[in-house]
Amino acid sequence: SIIQNKLFANIAVIMKSNYIHFICHGNIHETHKDKYIGTTNVPLSDKGKMELKKLDHNMKYPGATALFTSPLKRCKETCEILYPNMKPIVIDQLSECNFGEWEGKTADELKDDELFKQWIGGSSEVKPPHGESSADFTRRICHMFEDIVTGLMKTGTTDAIIVTHGGVIMTLLAIYGLPQAKPFDWVMDGGYGYSIRITPMLWQRDKVSEVFQKIPLPKEDGEE
């Protein structure tokens, strides 16, 4: 009957999975190596841009109807290279952790700082001076991520790309990803990332998603 068909159509919409593709921004200049670079607004290096273009040429990045990015230059530039025809939606909460006065410093430079010792020892509520604690950082990105998922479900947007920072992606996958793993198990190089599948029932019940592939993907034979 017509009523039955409408009911099944509504159920199909409710049950439709959402896909989010996380991509870590390309590489920044090697002079920043081993430094805490969070909200410092450094651009991609020329080498980083070339590496992204090469990845884009040799491999396959997923398509989507929505593109979200951190406000920081290195993420926006990554969007311009990988998705030149899409207009990204800038979300401030997708920014990397704010390391405050520790920005631009190495662990070696900070090793005698008592606050730093507590922070590096895993104390989630310890804040760098004028920065944010790891607990604050986690709360910020979790609220943002859940808002994005809710928005995708409400608008029927099945595919989205999030271009952000390694710390953001690793933390979100450790909290919401299956198989369960620690943040550093999800570490990735610049230009790489992971795709997750969000099934509405599983999300509403347990707030979890399935990490099902690394990206970019190898090109299939004959693909340009």
Language model regions located:
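Conserved histidine-centered catalytic loops in small-molecule metabolism enzymes
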Residues: 16, 62-93, 174, 197-224
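Short beta-strand scaffold positions
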Residues: 69-70, 139, 163-164
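Generic beta-sheet signal
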Residues: 20, 156-166
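Glycine-rich phosphate-binding loop signature in dinucleotide/nucleotide-binding domains
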Residues: 60-63, 148-158
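Active-site-proximal alpha-helix that buttresses catalytic centers in soluble enzyme cores
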Residues: 23-86
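Domain-level recognition of soluble alpha/beta enzyme cores
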Residues: 179-207
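Phosphate-handling substructures
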Residues: 82-142
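N-terminal amphipathic/basic-hydrophobic helices that include classical n-h-c signal peptides
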Residues: 1-14
